A protein has these predicted regions:
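A short, highly charged nucleic-acid-interacting micro-segment common to nuclease
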Residues: 1-3
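Catalytic core of non-heme Fe(II) oxygenases with the double-stranded beta-helix
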Residues: 7-103, 107
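Catalytic core of Fe(II)/2-oxoglutarate
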Residues: 67, 73-166
Length: 166
């Protein structure tokens, strides 16, 4: 939450200004994946995500991604469908170790986490950053991920300036 971290992420990306994600349910996200858990293919609602591996599972839990498969104004459904249908041509893997830090553009990068295997859960700290300080998750996204919708999700539910679907 520090200004130093915000500046660090901004400098690494070469993008300024950026803002902390305003969504009260998603702004301080921690991801815990229990054994047999998976995170399916998806795009983030925010432009930038920082991922810090806290605890690694014994096996699995690999971050897979297709960088920049879509861009503002272009969902690129054809290429996304290929990946969802099993085409791994554009898929890359990143096997994060404890302490590894990655910054990625999850709004434009299709990504997932493979099945966590063994008895050890996967713990990740994932603060998020946006170009628009007003944006929050859509009500549908919030309900699907966090199990609830807050008034702010309804108040700020609008078409995204980049024309992409959350």
């Amino acid at each position: 939450e520090t200004e130093e971290l915000l500046k660090f992420v901004s400098l690494c990306l070469g993008v300024s200004p950026i803002y902390r994600w305003a969504d009260p349910l998603a702004c301080h996200a921690y991801n815990v994946m229990k054994p047999n858990g998976i995170l399916p293919w998806h795009f983030d609602s925010c432009e930038f995500t920082l991922s810090l591996m806290i605890k690694k599972p014994e096996k699995g839990g690999i971050f897979e991604y297709c960088p920049f498969i879509r861009e503002p104004g272009n969902e690129n459904f054809e290429e996304v469908k290929k990946v969802l249908d099993g085409d791994r041509t554009k898929v890359r893997q990143l096997n994060l170790e404890v302490g590894d830090l990655q910054i990625f553009k999850g709004r434009f990068t299709l990504h997932r986490v493979t099945k966590v295997e063994g008895k050890t859960p996967r713990y990740l700290c994932i603060p998020a950053y946006v170009l628009d300080p007003w944006r929050v998750n859509t009500p549908e996204h919030s309900k699907a991920i966090y199990g609830k919708v807050l008034p702010i999700h309804i108040e700020r539910n609008e078409i995204r300036s980049d024309g992409l679907t959350d």
